[in-house]
Curated annotation (Swiss-Prot):
Gene Ontology molecular functions: 3-isopropylmalate dehydrogenase activity; magnesium ion binding; NAD binding
Protein's name in the database: 3-isopropylmalate dehydrogenase
SMART domains given in the database record: Iso_dh
Organism field: Haemophilus influenzae (strain ATCC 51907 / DSM 11121 / KW20 / Rd)
GO cellular component, as recorded: cytosol
Record bears the keyword Nucleotidyltransferase: no
Lineage: Bacteria, Pseudomonadati, Pseudomonadota, Gammaproteobacteria, Pasteurellales
């Protein structure tokens, strides 16, 4: 029987509550599909500060090193905002984990589920078509990290500058990740750039076009970033996999998230070249609702499904979780963030309903 070790970092706020439901669902699929998941829990973020004095203790990092994947909850809260920036839960835990494991590829799915169209801010006729896309964002290159960057001069002559730098190998590996993701989905990649203006985008487009030759089953199209932001509003159903540089992906992934209508539904994954991944909900720790049993666990549960798909290649089990989520939503069950006139189900009840639907 295939066995996998998972470092479970529930973190702060609603993290422990929603993580418990993800574990519940994972226990169901490992029983149904005949593989073994070993869960090892570690402190991270504010919880780690309280117990160990550091947001990312050495024991936690060691546990992650020994794992096959990291299932991450959420970190942060008002209790720790007065700490020095590098000691705060977000910057002191999540960023070092990304750096340590060389997580260069961010996957952000955005899906509008049947029955949730009214939460979509788009026109009703557009929302009625639904959409199911994933944004593939390069995480370690581009203008956020390029050199030189800085400020110089004074008075009206003060200037600030940043540099957009991409190496061909950086574009190749993120393009490969996008094409591989498309192979598991609807076999279409839309590469986002600004090749009519930027040299970095010209290299981006050339390289992605070359890479496409290795994936003849996948349809490739190129789109300028300004047009991409418009088409996301006009016809989101036309997208499958959106391939983006760091800064363009930062913008596009948030736009795609907002048109779904609920951050509580959105998972994410950050991967390295070996397929090792950190999987987490796209939303935050929501300390205002922590402990009330009303948080939506679906983003955490879908993050677990992504882990099965992208790190372990357990596509059938991942499909089963995603189908169960769709079934439960289609039957009208809602947590408080999505409930209207109906009585909302609790965090634990939603987890149980999804588990039973598998």
């Amino acid at each position: 029987m295939q066995s996998y070790n998972i470092a479970v970092l529930a973190g702060d706020g609603i993290g422990p509550e929603v993580m418990a439901e993800a574990i519940k669902v994972l226990n169901r699929v490992q029983e149904k599909f005949g593989f073994k998941l070993n869960f090892n829990e570690f402190f991270v973020g504010g919880a780690a500060i309280e117990h160990c004095g550091y947001p990312l203790p050495a024991e936690t990092l060691k546990g992650c090193d020994q794992a096959d994947a990291i299932l991450f909850g959420s970190v942060g809260g008002p209790k720790w905002t007065n700490l020095p920036p590098d000691q705060q839960p977000e910057r002191g835990a999540l960023l070092p984990l990304r750096k340590h494991f060389k997580l260069f590829c961010n996957l952000r799915p955005a899906t509008l589920y049947k029955g949730l169209e009214k939460f979509c801010p788009l026109r009703a006729d557009i929302a009625a078509k639904g959409f199911d896309m994933v944004v593939v964002r390069e995480l370690t290159g581009g203008i956020y990290f390029g050199q030189p960057k800085g400020r110089e001069g004074d008075g009206v002559q003060t200037k600030a500058f940043d540099t957009e730098v991409y190496y061909k190998y950086e574009i190749e590996r993120i393009a490969r990740a996008a094409f591989e993701a498309a192979m598991k989905r609807n076999k279409k990649v839309t590469s986002v750039d600004k090749a009519n203006v930027l040299q970095s985008s010209i290299l981006w487009r050339e390289t992605v076009t070359e890479m496409a030759k290795d994936y003849p089953e996948v349809t490739l199209e190129h789109i300028y970033i300004d047009n991409a932001t418009m088409q996301l509003i006009k016809s989101p159903e036309s997208f499958d996999v959106l391939l983006c540089s760091n800064i363009f992906g930062d913008i596009i992934s948030d736009e795609a998230a907002m048109i779904t209508g609920s951050m509580g539904m959105l998972p994410s994954a950050s991967l390295n070249e070996e397929g090792f991944g950190l999987y987490e909900p796209a939303g935050g720790s929501a300390p205002d609702i922590a402990g009330k049993g009303i948080a939506n666990p679906i983003a955490q549960i879908l993050s677990a499904a992504m882990m099965l798909r992208y790190s372990f290649n357990l596509n059938e089990a991942a499909d089963a979780i995603e189908s169960a989520v769709q079934k439960v939503l289609a039957s009208g069950h809602r947590t408080a963030d999505l409930a209207d006139d109906s009585t909302p189900v609790s965090t634990a009840e939603m987890g149980t309903l999804i588990t039973q639907a598998i």
